[in-house]
Amino acid sequence: MKHIVKNIHFVGIGGAGMSGIAEVLLNLGYKVSGSDVGSNAATRRLASLGATVMHGHDAANIAGANAVVVSTAVSGDNPEVLAARSKRIPVVPRAVMLAELMRLKQGVAIAGTHGKTTTTSLVASVLAEGGLDPTFVIGGRLNSAGANARLGTGDFIVAEADESDASFLNLFPVIEVITNIDADHMDTYGHDFARLKQAFIEFTQRLPFYGIAVLCVDDPNVREILPFVSKPVVRYGFAEDAQIRAVNARAVDGQMHFTVLRHLNGHAEPPLDVVLNLPGLHNVQNALAAIAIATELEVPDAAIVKALREFHGVGRRFQRYGEVATADGTGTFTLVDDYGHHPVEMAATLSAARGAFPGRRLVLAFQPHRFTRTRDCFEDFVKVLGTVDALLLAEVYAAGEAPIVAADGRALTRALRVAAKVEPVFVEQMEEMPQAIMNAARPGDVVVTMGAGSIGAVPGQVVSHQQPLQAGGAA
């Protein structure tokens, strides 16, 4: 970036995507400041690294800034944004700043409706094990690194490419992954699925002539756009025509064992026997994307196998909190947390839980995310929520949206009771959810907390406060 830009301010610095970029810029030697409405692990980490973090938004916060970075979650009437515009300080969208970072390295961009964070983390881990020391910016905390971003000394930067606001079209990577294409964030695309698919086609057109599009051909919508991708393609998945193909996949003690058949550049690579330290067939697909990239970049097979076997996961992606004592003290239940908030990814995670813990009762504590998504996917939510053995259902996490009639937690509860697949317990306040979990959990249960909103704090509360919690509370 130009030498005149020395001080960079982030509005909403605690967000997953924003904090990662801020950390990389700190490590590059820039002076970084930022504001957010509250404190979280990301803001505390950035402060410990030297960033100036302010709580609350105020025009005075941008003093001395040469550029102000904003995400789509920041409204145009934010006082810091208004002050920056009045002072003619550049207001830079998060994706544009990420694109600038990609110009410093060779970009590997991971796109898709589901699986971006896990796939990005797997790619970064495999490349790191292969000695390529990548820079990475991830939407979740990579447990092995203790952070969601890192400045590496190697040539590559691995980052998520966000289709939710079409901002991935700002990026110009040399390698792209598309994990899947599903109907989500449809407001961005005028509720026109064809426009969403066209955006992914345009994303592949950002590649240079020597670039590679790594595409999951198990997904019917990815397969549908395949004829319109003009750049070199590597197909991965379980499908017979996949060039990076998994066969004989099976769940063993919470891990996935499978063999990878590889046919690239006109010849077959030796089969690769893999143990992935994650559950679920969807994570096998995510790992195949990492294997495809690693094989293209000539990472040794031994490094690929080691990275996947020793993968420590990502925060809030099937994150295991271990065993928790039941309220009556007669046994324990297993507590798992996941970020899933779309019916497709929820179904994949619940299937993975069944595979990882066969024969055990599955209890789901779910907080829907956004009223628009609840409205648009209402019947699919009812279907997937009806597959669990017991359900605790919270009110929708609004994420800034106004309520929509018949698209809230109570409406889902009523629909589930009519469907008669599971008897849901509606938990009106999130503060009541830890107690509701303790009330519901029996010895031997697997309890999964799920959602992209405030429910992410609940597992820690259950673990840290399990002693004071007794039977009773929310019904």
Swiss-Prot record:
The protein, known as: UDP-N-acetylmuramate--L-alanine ligase
GO process terms (BP): cell division; cell wall organization; peptidoglycan biosynthetic process; regulation of cell shape
SUPFAM superfamilies: MurCD N-terminal domain, MurD-like peptide ligases, catalytic domain, MurD-like peptide ligases, peptide-binding domain
Keywords associated with the record: ATP-binding, Cell cycle, Cell division, Cell shape, Cell wall biogenesis/degradation, Cytoplasm, Ligase, Nucleotide-binding, Peptidoglycan synthesis
Recorded superkingdom: Bacteria
Signal peptide coordinates: none
Subcellular location: Cytoplasm
Family annotation (PANTHER family): UDP-N-ACETYLMURAMATE--L-ALANINE LIGASE, UDP-N-ACETYLMURAMATE--L-ALANINE LIGASE-RELATED
Similarity field: Belongs to the MurCDEF family.
Enzyme class, broadest EC rank: ligase
Binding site residues for ATP: 112-118
Free-text function comment from the UniProt entry: Cell wall formation.
First-listed, main subcellular location of the protein, grouped into a coarse class: cytoplasm
Disulphide bridges: none
Catalytic activity: UDP-N-acetyl-alpha-D-muramate + L-alanine + ATP = UDP-N-acetyl-alpha-D-muramoyl-L-alanine + ADP + phosphate + H(+)
Listed pathway(s): Cell wall biogenesis; peptidoglycan biosynthesis
Gene Ontology CC: one annotated term: cytoplasm
E.C. number: 6.3.2.8
GO molecular-function terms, A-Z: ATP binding; UDP-N-acetylmuramate-L-alanine ligase activity
Alphabetical list of NCBIfam families matching this protein: murC
Organism: Cupriavidus pinatubonensis (strain JMP 134 / LMG 1197) (Cupriavidus necator (strain JMP 134))
Pfam family, one: Mur_ligase_C
